[in-house]
Amino acid sequence: MSERMIELKGIVKRFYIGMPNELEILHGIDLEVKRGEFVSIVGSSGSGKTTMMNIIGILDRPTEGEYQLDGVDVAKAKDKELSLIRNQKIGFVFQTYNLIGRTSALKNVELPMLYAGIGRRERKERAKELLEMVGMEERLSHNPDELSGGQK
């Protein structure tokens, strides 16, 4: 198993805003993230952080460059393989939460595990553990509108 989990080489991302206009957001980004390593992406508003995270999270593709995720060449992977990778290897905490409004905190945490094919009992136990880890053991049955911004 490779030490490198994420490897970007020469990543360029351009958006086309009508011919001949184009807007280049990422200009040849190189990044290597090793297994178990924590990385922060920081920069001013409009600097391309979200664009880069969308590429890393396989929500978008680069215009140019190479992207290897855990040894898989993302550019050459088929859609079905990319869906599996997203489900098993990539996790996102979105700025806008994307929680299901009429669903408890526990069920919102369980949902990705359902898509991963994890059984009901294990999902519930793991979701409880995760919520307890962040001090939300008293909020398991609360819906998103009953949670603070930080709890969401």
Model-derived segments and spans:
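ABC family nucleotide-binding domain
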Residues: E3-K152
